[in-house]
Amino acid sequence: MLINFLLVGFGASLGAMLRYGISIFVKSKWKTDFPYATFFINITGSFLLGFLVSTALGPMWQLFLGTGFMGGYTTFSTFKVESMELKWKANFQVLFSYVGLTYLCGLIAAFIGIMLGV
């Protein structure tokens, strides 16, 4: 049982570090109101998690990669906070684009990941 917690924890720490690195890189390249870093992370995360759940990985790999790594990599809470910040700035065009594209592209990416993993 302890090994399961270690797998999830180690995977999550790696995923969070990758998310942080991508976020720093993207924010340094594109100065815009649209949260491209979080958008990219969540869309690629949707694809990768879709792929992972549709493959025949063993339960330990699922814990490490699916629950751990992907849980640390993707960020639903940052998506919500950035959405609220756009609302508070009254930047409704970017807000609705961000929310709509995140959900639509996330579903499409997850579907493609699942189809490729089958």
Curated annotation (Swiss-Prot):
- Residues involved in Na(+) binding: 71, 74
Q: What is this protein called?
A: Fluoride-specific ion channel FluC 1
Q: Does the keyword Ion transport apply?
A: yes
| HAMAP family membership | FluC (MF_00454)
Q: Report the function annotation for this chain.
A: Fluoride-specific ion channel. Important for reducing fluoride concentration in the cell, thus reducing its toxicity.
Matching entries from Pfam families are given as:
CRCB
Major place of residence: membrane
Q: One GO term of the cellular component aspect? A: plasma membrane
To which species is this protein native? Listeria innocua serovar 6a (strain ATCC BAA-680 / CLIP 11262)
